[in-house]
Regions:
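Residue-level preference for the first positions of well-ordered beta-strands
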Residues: 4, 99-103, 139
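Glycine-rich phosphate-binding loop signature in dinucleotide/nucleotide-binding domains
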Residues: 44-47, 95-100
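Conserved histidine-centered catalytic loops in small-molecule metabolism enzymes
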Residues: 48-69, 74-75, 143-179
Length: 179
C-alpha cells in the first residue's frame, strides 16, 4: 500500500501583485490556514517520507510552514510542478518507487486534473461535494493499493480524507474500482 498526500499552497497575496504569478507570496490568512491544516495532520501521527513541491514562492512558503509542524526530512523542488498537467503529476509519481508516502505541494487546476486521472468518477463526485476545486491549504490523502508507484492506475485507490483549513471533512473511504 502506498499513500499520496496532495496539499494545495496557502492562499496567495494579491496586494501589490505585479503580474509575476510565480513570485506571489502567501497572505496572513493563508499562513494561519496552512498551520491549522498541519496541526490537524499532526494529530493523525502519519509519516511523510518524501515531499515534492513546486518552485513557486507561495508553495515554498507553504512547505516551510507545514514543515515547522510536521518535520519532513526528504524534500525536493520540482520546477515543472508549477503550471503542470495532471498527467505530469501522474508520471512524476510513477518514478518515486522507494517511498511509501509522498506529499505533493502544488496548484490548481493541476491537482483536480490529476484526481480526474487517478480517482474514478464516483469518488470524484464525493470530492466535488466540497466544492468545484481543491481550496487553498487543503490536504487530501489517497491510499493506493500497489506495491510500487510505477503500477498506479484508476483501480483500487481510496480517498481517505480531505482536511480543509476551516473544517475537517473526515474519513471518506470511497474506493475506486473503475478500470
Amino acid at each position: 500500500m502506498k499513500y499520496l498526500y496532495l496539499l494545495r499552497h496557502g492562499k496567495s497575496l494579491w496586494k501589490d501583485y505585479d503580474g509575476n504569478d510565480h513570485e506571489r507570496d502567501i497572505s496572513k490568512k493563508g499562513i494561519e490556514k496552512t498551520k491549522n491544516v498541519a496541526e490537524k495532520f499532526l494529530l493523525k501521527n502519519e509519516i511523510i517520507e518524501l515531499c515534492l513541491y513546486s518552485s513557486s514562492r507561495r508553495t515554498k512558503k507553504t512547505l516551510r510552514i507545514f514543515n515547522k509542524i510536521i518535520q519532513i526530512n526528504n524534500k525536493r523542488e520540482k520546477k515543472k510542478l508549477y503550471h503542470c498537467s495532471g498527467t505530469y503529476i501522474f508520471n512524476l509519481i510513477k518514478k518515486q518507487n522507494a517511498k511509501k508516502s509522498i506529499l505533493i505541494i502544488g496548484h490548481e487546476p493541476s491537482f483536480s486534473e490529476f484526481l480526474d486521472i487517478i480517482i474514478n468518477s464516483n469518488v470524484k463526485i464525493n470530492l466535488s461535494l466540497l466544492g468545484e476545486k481543491i481550496y487553498t491549504s487543503s490536504l487530501i490523502k489517497i491510499a493506493i493499493d500497489v506495491s510500487t508507484w510505477a503500477n498506479i492506475n484508476r483501480k483500487n485507490n481510496t480517498l481517505i480524507y480531505h482536511i480543509c483549513p476551516d473544517k475537517y471533512v473526515g474519513e471518506m473511504k470511497k474506493k475506486s474500482n473503475q478500470s
